A protein has these predicted regions:
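Conserved SAM-binding strand-loop segment of SAM-dependent methyltransferases
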Residues: 1-10
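A short acidic, Gly/Pro-enriched loop at the edge of an enzyme's catalytic core
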Residues: 10-19
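A short SAM/SAH-binding and catalytic strip from SAM-dependent methyltransferases
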Residues: 18-31
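S-adenosyl-L-methionine-dependent methyltransferase catalytic module, highlighting the catalytic core
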Residues: 30-41, 45-138
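Active-site micro-motifs of SAM-dependent methyltransferase domains
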Residues: 7, 27, 55
Length: 139
């Protein structure tokens, strides 16, 4: 399926898919909260993957450089104004958004270390670079 993710999702009927998967997408869409709410009607299960902007190494980069470029860029040619990251967020930020939108967080997974984690068992917000969330629509 190909199209503008900000628009195309609205055209699908209720419960069209078993799973919807967003990888490296949620931070680049115009309105992540609206997209997630729209996906609720399309699927009861949503997998969301993103880079954790709240990890310790990113915080230290910003502290030492004083520049958002160090937080947002993927390569040396990227600057804060031309990166595809519109909404950098941390694991903690995404957990709050998920709760605010009435999603149940079924599981979270540290992609780099290939480890599942739960609240309090791993300092995920500080050390996890890439994360996957399995969300379930509670409605």
């Amino acid at each position: 399926i190909h199209g503008d993710i900000n628009l195309i999702v609205e055209d699908f009927p209720y419960n069209q898919f078993d799973y919807c998967i967003l990888t490296q997408t949620i931070q680049a869409v115009q309105k992540p909260d609206v997209l997630l709410n729209t996906l609720k009607k399309v699927s009861k299960n949503i997998i969301v993957g993103f880079n954790n902007s709240g990890r310790l190494s990113k915080s230290l980069q910003f502290l030492l450089s004083g520049s958002f470029d160090s937080l947002l860029k993927k390569s040396d040619s990227d600057q804060w104004y031309n990166t595809d990251y519109i909404h950098p967020c941390s694991i903690k930020d995404f957990k709050k958004l998920s709760t605010d939108l009435n999603f149940k967080i079924v599981s979270t997974f540290d992609v780099i270390n290939m480890a599942q984690f739960t609240n309090g068992k791993m300092p995920s917000n500080l050390f996890c670079k890439e994360v996957l969330f399995h969300l379930k629509n509670e409605r």
